[in-house]
A protein has these predicted regions:
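Residue-level marker of intrinsically disordered, low-complexity segments enriched
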Residues: 1-2, 10, 71, 124, ...
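Interdomain "pre-motor" coupling segment immediately N-terminal to P-loop NTPase/helicase cores
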Residues: 1-20
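Walker A/P-loop NTP-binding motif of AAA+ ATPase domains
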Residues: 15-223, 229, 241
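C-terminal engagement/docking regions of AAA+ P-loop ATPases
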Residues: 14-25, 221-236, 246-283
Length: 283
C-alpha cells in the first residue's frame, strides 16, 4: 500500500468493496434520490468532458432522512453503476482512544482511496464524528474533525483525484457548519409513499417466491395501512409474515417439512392493527 501506514491500512482495506454488485433497480422507491445521484455521479463518469466547468460534478454528497430508507444501499448502487471502488466506513472505524490514531486512520483512508481511485468513501452516521463543535469537545475529537476537513479539502481540490465522499445522517442539523459546506449536494431520502410501499412489498415477496396466493389489491390495502413505515420496517414485516405458516406446523413434523409444503400467505379479512401487520394482515 503506497504511502499508507500498514497498521491502519489493513483495517481499512477490510471495509473496501471492489464491486458491490448492487444496482439502482434493486432499491425500491427513492426515485427522486436515484435521479439526483445518477445525475451527480453516474452521468459524469459516462462523459467526463461534457461535465466540466459549471457542470463539474461535486465531490461531496450528503444523504439525509429517517433511518432505514436505503442510504447505504443507494451509495453501494451508485458505486457499482459508476464502476468505482467503495469504502463503507463506520464512525467506529475512524475513532480511537489513542491520541493521534484517529488522524492517522483518516489520512490512511484518503490515501488508500487515492491509490484505488476512482473511489467512493461512504461514511455512515457521519454526525457522530463530525457534529457541531462545542466547548465539550475533547482534544481528540477536535483534532479528528480538523484532519478530516484537511483530507477532504485535499481530495476535492486536486483535479487528478477522483474521490467522492458520501455522508449519511439522520440528523443533518447536528453537523458542523464547516462540514455541511463541503457537502453542496444534499439529498433527502424520506419515508416511502404509498406507491413505493406497494412496490417494495411486492418486490420483496416475489423475490422470495411468497407472492403466490396474494394479489395487487391485497398489497395495496396493506400499503395504505402502513403509512410512516420505513423501507427496513416493511422488509421486517415481510420476514415476520413469512414465519406465520411455519408456526402452524406441528413441531414433531417441522424437521422433515419441505418448504414447498408450506401454505401460501393470505390477507385476513380485517386489518385492525397494522402494528401487528404480519399476524393481522398477511397470515
Amino acid at each position: 500500500m503506497k504511502c499508507v501506514d500498514a497498521k491502519f491500512g489493513d483495517r481499512l482495506l477490510d471495509e473496501m468493496l471492489d464491486r458491490t454488485g448492487v444496482r439502482l433497480s434493486d432499491v425500491a422507491g427513492c426515485e427522486s434520490a436515484k435521479e439526483a445521484l445518477e445525475e451527480a455521479v453516474i452521468l459524469p463518469v459516462m462523459n467526463p468532458k461534457l461535465f466540466s466547468g459549471l457542470r463539474q460534478p461535486v465531490k461531496g454528497i450528503l444523504l439525509f432522512g429517517p433511518p432505514g430508507n436505503g442510504k447505504t444501499l443507494l451509495a453501494k448502487a451508485v458505486a457499482s453503476e459508476s464502476n468505482q471502488v467503495f469504502f463503507n466506513i463506520s464512525a467506529a472505524s475512524l475513532t480511537s482512544k489513542w491520541v493521534g490514531d484517529a488522524e492517522k486512520t483518516i489520512r490512511s483512508l484518503f490515501q488508500i482511496a487515492r491509490n484505488a481511485q476512482p473511489a467512493i468513501i461512504f461514511i455512515d452516521e457521519i454526525d457522530s464524528i463530525l457534529c457541531d463543535r462545542s466547548e465539550k469537545d475533547t482534544e481528540v475529537s477536535r483534532r479528528m474533525k480538523t484532519e478530516f476537513l484537511i483530507q477532504f479539502d485535499g481530495a476535492t481540490s486536486n483535479p487528478d483525484d477522483r474521490i467522492l465522499v458520501i455522508g449519511a445522517t439522520n440528523r443533518p442539523y447536528d453537523l458542523d457548519d464547516a462540514v455541511l459546506r463541503r457537502f453542496p449536494k444534499r439529498i433527502l431520502l424520506d419515508l416511502p409513499d404509498e406507491s413505493a410501499r406497494f412496490t417494495l412489498l411486492k418486490t420483496t415477496l416475489v423475490k422470495h417466491n411468497m407472492y403466490e396466493g396474494l394479489d395487487d389489491y391485497d398489497l395495496r390495502r396493506i400499503a395504505q395501512q402502513t403509512e410512516g413505515y420505513s423501507n427496513s420496517d416493511l422488509v421486517a414485516l415481510c420476514k415476520e409474515a413469512a414465519m406465520v405458516p411455519v408456526r402452524s406446523i406441528d413441531r414433531k413434523k417441522l424437521a422433515s417439512c419441505d418448504e414447498s409444503k408450506l401454505r401460501n400467505l393470505r390477507v385476513c379479512s380485517s386489518i385492525k392493527n397494522v402494528a401487528n401487520f404480519s399476524e393481522r394482515a398477511m397470515c
